[in-house]
Every structure is written in structure tokens, then in C-alpha cells.
């Protein structure tokens, strides 16, 4: 079920800890004392753009437009994304919560929060969880989706363990903290 107006552009604004950018950036932060700095990067050519495009198109069966703006923040780990979506006519926030709860009902590591819950990367540190919150916009035809993960667990080793468990038919949480 498509819940968004597919003629509109999705805006994805992601804030990431510098651990996800590699050793070079970690050294740059340390050497140049950039711990009080926030910076955007990879606007038109970020390495995840093609993956985002692929998954959006696969889910909707058509070409989608989106803008992905990643930012490096002065924190070591975690990713907090804010996603702005235009709704399809007749869709409201309660329907979206229903769809998300149905879609992820058997996923131990995806947690759907109550409407308008503000998320923090601290909510997921040292977990394999992805927290999702759907928030109301001041416009009735738009929503704001928040998601938070620990990029060193869910974005790395924890996701690899979960995928291996799924591949070999183990319980997906085997070896992971739930």
C-alpha cells in the first residue's frame, strides 16, 4: 500500500556520529578539534543514494524523487534521521501507524513509537534496534518520520549477525541483545 504522494519529493535529513565516516574523519575530528562542528557532506553523490533509490523504487514500482542530506555531528556513534513525506489523499497519521505496526509486527529489532515521540540516539546506543516515530506536521497532507539507530551495532556488526541468523534459519535475535 502506497501511503505517500509519489509525485512529491521525499526529504531525508540524517545526522550521524563521526564513527560511521571512517578512521580518517575520526582523526580529523581529533586533530582539528571539530567536536563543536556540524557539517553536511555528499549531497549529490553520497554512497547510499543508489541504495535509497533502489529500495524506494522497489517498494513503489516506480521511479521516486528524494533528497538525502547526511550530516556529521560531534558525537561518536548513532544516526538520527528526519524524513519529510507528502501523504497520498485519504491517508492520515493513524493509518500510517497501523501500516507500520502491521509491516514490522514480527521484527524484534524495529520498534514503532507512539505518535509524536521525539527520538534520541541515546535511546538506541548499544542496541540492534531501529526506533521509528511518526510525527504530525503543521500541514495535514504531510508527516515527519524520525528514526534512530546505533550505526556501530544496527548499522554494522549487529545487522550482519541478524542477517546471518535469518539466512541460516536461526532465531533472528540469536547472539544479540533484544
Cite the ranges covered by each PLM segment.
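NAD(P)-dependent Rossmann-like dehydrogenase/reductase catalytic/cofactor-binding core
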Residues: 131-132, 136-178
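Short, small-residue-biased leader/transition segments that mark boundaries at the very start
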Residues: 1-3
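A short alpha->loop->secondary-structure connector
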Residues: 5-7
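C-terminal substrate-binding/catalytic lobe of Rossmann-fold NAD(P)-dependent oxidoreductases
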Residues: 9, 13-14, 18-145
